[in-house]
Amino acid sequence: MHTYIVAGIRRDPRFSPHHEASDEAIFHLTAEALRARGCTVREYTEADLWADAVSADAVFGMARDPRSIRCLQRMEDGGLPVVNSGYAIARCGREPMTRLLTEADLPHPRSLILPTADDPVPALASAAIDACWVKRADGHVVGAGDVTFAASREVTREVFRRLSDDGIRTAVVNEHLTGDLVKFYGVAGTDFFYAFYPTATHHGKFGLEQVNGPARGIAYDADALRTTCHRAATVLGLRVYGGDCIVSDTDGLVRLIDFNDWPSFAPCREAAAPFIASCIIGSIGLRPGSYAPSGASSQK
């Protein structure tokens, strides 16, 4: 019987602001769950990807550096199963994600994609957006300034100036939604789905979850949330995912405000890891292949 060799790619700490230990924990638990299922797991860094030092029958990982994403895409193009897909990770950049979720008619805040060199106030007025969230459009969040709550159009103008001065050319603007903030985690093709109130557990990166205040327990349709999240994951091509939504305090509807490739699963990592391992093993069965670059010998 063939023993599958699975390469695990750790996330570079730059892409784990305030969550380095949590990201490392879910990576470790997933690797152990795969080993318990009979796989040989080789652990690599994102730098190993750039050096073409990865050899395996399949890859799982949390890479987010643009160079790493391109490496994963090349592996996929060569027939290697990769979870999450490099193409799916790229779609989780703010701009492509906003376009895709909007085009798929998924419940989502009114959003604009604007050049930071422009004055955003006319576009905000036209869209009837006042308080909003301003997010850099080019890739994943790596610092507190990459996502900013702007309480007014004038504040948004100031945020645009700062982003432009920092060399960020495009911003995504999401209208601010009032209501309960709910965070969720899921694994496609499995029964795993977990949702919770982050303010109740003090779970967050930069304290931005405090803008909406403590959860009030506004009633919402949990099955509808799960269905919406699975739909969004399918649109983006993600298999291991998480994100945030707002349960409206006016109509009780759930709207997605963020969607991520392979989050930390911090409050539920022990329960999630076996399902993630099953997802990875299932991908091997769906897309048999192997990848061994010439001279590859690095094994962590």
Which residues does each PLM region occupy?
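Phosphate-binding site of ATP-dependent enzymes
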Residues: 148-236
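Anionic group-transfer/hydrolysis microenvironments
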Residues: 137, 176-177, 185, 244-246, ...
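Active-site nucleotide/adenylate-binding loops and adjacent lid/helix of ATP-dependent enzymes
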Residues: 6-9, 79, 87-174, 178-179, ...
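A short beta-strand motif that forms the metal-chelation/ATP-contact edge
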Residues: 56-60, 184-186, 251-267
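A long amphipathic alpha-helix within ATP-dependent nucleotide-binding catalytic cores
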Residues: 204-256, 277-292
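Conserved N-proximal alpha/beta basic substrate-recognition cap immediately N-terminal to
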Residues: 8-113
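Protein kinase-like catalytic core scaffold
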Residues: 132, 172, 192, 253-258
